[in-house]
Amino acid sequence: EPNSADAQYRFAIAASYLAEVGQELHDKTLAFSAAESGIPAAERAVALNANSAEYNRILGTLCGQAISGNGLAALKYGKCALNSVNRAIELDPKSSDAFLSQGVGYFYLPSALGGGVDMAVKDFQKALELNPKSAEAYLWLGIAMRRTNRNPEARKALESALELNPNRLWAKQQLDKIPPK
């Protein structure tokens, strides 16, 4: 349904989930191709309803996921990731998911291109302020803390993620990467 924003959005969400599976399996080719396959659908959803914070968020998320699957894609998709998620936040400043998506984008975008782990951490914390039950925000906060060698904080965040979503394999894998106390 090319003229249904909702149908385009649902396709984009499916592509984003597949890209996340690729990330969890450490299959960058799958992560990149899945994310890239969803971008046109997300762009179409935004074109059909530019005032939807969620449609803008998923577009930014997919652009960020494409970057995570292929670092060179930052040149092509970096601006899309930042602008789309910024637009989502502008449309809905209380969206925990929008701040989470922005944080993931910053996590993968090199500091030289306007991203970085420190900026990501701020967004993950904001996402948790808006939704303290966000297992995904705790997961990403833990990943970011581990990246900066803040292992006690990383462990705490990942344990919180697993409390909220005990079946999340990626959170378990991330927790296993942290040296014991």
Residue ranges and their predicted role:
Residues 118, 136, 140-143, 147-181:
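Terminal, low-structured helical/coil segments at or just beyond the last alpha-helical repeat
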Residues 6-56:
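Mid-chain, structured segments of secreted extracytoplasmic proteins
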Residues 2-3, 50, 93, 132, ...:
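Short coil turns that delineate tetratricopeptide repeat
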Residues 59-65, 78, 86-87, 92-129, ...:
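Alpha-helical adaptor scaffolds
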Residues 5-6, 53-54, 96-97, 135-136, ...:
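Helix-start (N-cap) detector for alpha-helical repeat units in TPR-like alpha-solenoids
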